[in-house]
Regions:
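Charged/polar, solvent-exposed surface patches and flexible loops
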Residues: 8, 12, 16, 20, ...
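Amphipathic alpha-helical binding modules
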Residues: 72-101
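Amphipathic alpha-helical interaction modules
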Residues: 21-74
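Alpha-helix boundary/N-cap detector
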Residues: 1-16, 32-37, 55, 59, ...
């Protein structure tokens, strides 16, 4: 499986998690218009954690490394409000079996 296919699988997982839990873990959810940005970053975080697809940038790496100060320091104006969502995503979602085959 190539990296693009791996990322598509992860993106579907993140999108599903967003649809189910965004209103619970994103305090500003009713005002958020950046769903795609959040799904892209969530995908980057899980790809980095699971070592599939393409590795994420410095923010994704900081979240995966559990580095709170660096996570906030590298977060953009959207992600600063999404860190709890990303942490819950990272710790509550397991890698799909289709990625480990």
């Amino acid at each position: 499986m190539n990296p693009e296919e791996q990322q598509d699988i992860v993106r579907a997982v993140v999108s599903d998690y967003f649809d189910k839990y965004a209103d619970k873990y994103l305090p500003l959810y009713p005002k958020l218009t950046e769903k795609e940005h959040i799904i892209n970053i969530g995908t980057s975080i899980l790809c980095t954690k699971w070592k599939v697809g393409y590795p994420g940038g410095s923010f994704a790496k900081a979240v995966v490394d559990n580095n709170l100060s660096e996570s906030f320091g590298r977060a953009d104006e959207i992600n600063v409000h999404c860190i709890r969502f990303y942490l819950m995503l990272m710790y509550n979602v397991g890698a799909p079996t289709s990625l480990v085959q």
